[in-house]
Amino acid sequence: MKDRYILAFETSCDETSVAVLKNETELLSNVIASQIESHKRFGGVVPEVASRHHVEVITVCIEEALAEAGISEEQVTAVAVTYGPGLVGALLVGLAAAKSFAWAHDIPLIPVNHMAGHLMAAQSVEPLEFPLLALLVSGGHTELVYVSQAGDYKIVGETRDDAVGEAYDKVGRVMGLTYPAGREIDQLAHQGRDMYDFPRAMIKEDNLEFSFSGLKSAFINLHHNAQQKGEALSNQDLSASFQAAVMDILMAKTKKALEKYPVKTLVVAGGVAANQGLRERLAAEIQDVKVIIPPLRLCGDNAGMIAYASVSEWNKKNFAGLDLNAKPSLAFETME
């Protein structure tokens, strides 16, 4: 059988990425051009700046991905692209590049949900067994997803306000840390003590919903009040206390979901899945279910994960026309 090569594009936020996947499982290349340095001084992602950067580097990323994979343009069998959720201007750059490539080579265009990409990055670890449950934790999302089969995603619980990654970046800014702050808070937390009693919102409620706005506000108020009194607080202790509260919430809701939906596999994915504290808690507390976390290089935004997620869409012949548009608010369906 002839080899199949998927060329995948990811430009939903501040990473320009192009990857090549061979025969559904072998990731030959995964080129990522990060813009973090450009956004650091603003303390967050500036959509206009992100879009301009994507335009500047997308062509080079395509060339590098093909070269690294050792294939020519003519060998590409299909093109996969993130069409949402994300920043509309950023998404449009990837869509324009993907559609142009698909049109020029007369090959199928596969639309991929960015969050399905995060989830299916777990395929790089081992073949996934369905049904499974996924905890998706990133800068823009915190959700529990039931996956009955590849490509069939249903939200069973999500945040009512801030995403967990967003909360990390906001408290990081209060502590004077550079953006993005998640990794640094994780490191500081391992050096400090959990000595501040931050709220664990909705932790005892009988649902699978999350809330991080109260925790974020309590953190900001504590820090502000200490500054007003001229007291110096330890960033290590603040980080340890904040992270302990976050992990308590994530673990409580995940355990509750596993009770309600008895599956054999739990996938934990998204940028926050790189957090060492979260990985430690999962290893210590989730015993009877196989926990699969993508490798660190596939936790953040990347096109490799989009390629993995596109396989089930390809197998279902779920192709898009060249009129495919960006859907910045795209979301999985909610379980009824």
Swiss-Prot record:
It is found in: Cytoplasm. GO terms for biological process: tRNA threonylcarbamoyladenosine modification. Fe cation binds at H114, H118, D301. Its cofactor is Fe(2+). GO terms for cellular component: cytoplasm. Keywords: Acyltransferase, Cytoplasm, Iron, Metal-binding, Transferase, tRNA processing. Pfam families: TsaD. Its main location: cytoplasm. Substrate binds at L136, V137, S138, G139, G140, D169, G182, D186, N275. Required for the formation of a threonylcarbamoyl group on adenosine at position 37 (t(6)A37) in tRNAs that read codons beginning with adenine. Is involved in the transfer of the threonylcarbamoyl moiety of threonylcarbamoyl-AMP (TC-AMP) to the N6 group of A37, together with TsaE and TsaB. TsaD likely plays a direct catalytic role in this reaction. It catalyses: L-threonylcarbamoyladenylate + adenosine(37) in tRNA = N(6)-L-threonylcarbamoyladenosine(37) in tRNA + AMP + H(+). This is tRNA N6-adenosine threonylcarbamoyltransferase. It comes from the Bacteria. The gene is tsaD. Its EC number is 2.3.1.234. PROSITE patterns: GLYCOPROTEASE (PS01016). Binds 1 Fe(2+) ion per subunit. Belongs to the KAE1 / TsaD family. GO terms for molecular function: iron ion binding; N(6)-L-threonylcarbamoyladenine synthase activity.
